[in-house]
Amino acid sequence: MIIRPVDEVRGELNAPPSKSYTHRAYFLALLAEGESTIENPLVCDDTLATIEAIRSFGAGVDGKTVVPPEEPSPGFVYARESGTTARFSTALAGGIGGKTLIDGARRLRERPMDGLVKALKGLGAEVDGFSLPLTVKGPVKSGRVSVDASKSSQFVSGLLLLGAEVGLKVEARNPVSKPYIEMTLRTMEAFGVEFEREGFSFEVYPGVKGTRYKVPGDYSTASFFLAAGALYGKVRVNNLLREDVQADMAFLDALEEFGARVKRGRDYVKVEGGELKAVALDCSDFPDSFPILAVVAAYAEGRSVIRARQLRFKESDRVRAMAVNLSRMGVKVRELEDGLEIEGGRPRGAKVETFNDHRIAMAMSIAALGATGPSIIEDTESVSKSHPGFFDDLRRLLE
């Protein structure tokens, strides 16, 4: 795809539905007593993988309606490239008698599963393997577990869902991306799950109620369009609730640190450009924002440092991917173990790679809009993982 620089970006969009909430709603609907309706679900490669997964466990899915089985049954789950699908399915398989096989695409086979596997083994499940493909044979025999969550909060969220299935005490050690755990808890509350907590220790009681659940808008995908407003003009994104707990709401604070003007409405966010200055940021709690924050840093005056602990374990090695692409655009970049040091300026047009990573594709598309010449973004099809309509929305802002 060729993207040519523009003079400004001004416009208004509706945020797509949240991928994270959509995943959680479908898995809870699988466990529920009674039918559930998922309103406004995100339809993308990852959430389709989750729908296929809950079907393999015995749920009936007809559009937005989920009819749970009397008891989830073991089966085969192919998670495509969805880490959430793989980890939640692995955890829930621990509550089922019989063997479940979980597998995924090549990159997903490389992503960490060890913390979750060790936790399930500690609960008495039989697990063959520490990365995909693996088999899980339940049911678990113990009601208390401590999990190392330093590589992924999804280990914790998966065990919380298992708790809603069988009852469980969960202690999360060194959790990263903590807001995603809060999103899991909020969705559990919507499905009538009862739990107690003290910090990141939880006691979850079994029982999920079928419900009508409306998926909120997605701050993660909206961040790319809002960044375009900060860099090139003014953008408003609707369907973003101020009273939410999504991880990437912290992206707005980061934009303000850079010097952008941010207005948070009850159900919208508006961002307008300002004089952008370098910052030092740790986005370990909202790592999905790292690629687009690196792009903002490439245009900000001065030397920025953007870090997050788990960046090398995503759909791509995002530290390396952004270092390679920004360097091709003439940006001075130094690669750190857990992030990037970026000297801001005016990137030039270049041929860049997406590394088959949806967030790299989106970030580099925004970077290209302000470059000194046209850019070629290779393999943009990866955006279908989280927002198939990304480029349609971007074109609306440029009309």
Swiss-Prot record:
Catalyzes the transfer of the enolpyruvyl moiety of phosphoenolpyruvate (PEP) to the 5-hydroxyl of shikimate-3-phosphate (S3P) to produce enolpyruvyl shikimate-3-phosphate and inorganic phosphate. Signal peptide: none annotated. Monomer. One of its GO terms (biological process) is aromatic amino acid family biosynthetic process. Pathway: Metabolic intermediate biosynthesis; chorismate biosynthesis. The active site is at 288 (proton acceptor). This is 3-phosphoshikimate 1-carboxyvinyltransferase. One of its GO terms (cellular component) is cytoplasm. Its EC number is 2.5.1.19. Belongs to the EPSP synthase family. Its main location: cytoplasm. 3-phosphoshikimate binds at residues 19-20, 24, 152-154, 288, 310, 314. SUPFAM superfamilies: EPT/RTPC-like. InterPro entries: Enolpyruvate_Tfrase_dom, Enolpyruvate_Tfrase_sf, EPSP_synthase, EPSP_synthase_CS, RNA3'P_cycl/enolpyr_Trfase_a/b. It comes from the Archaea.
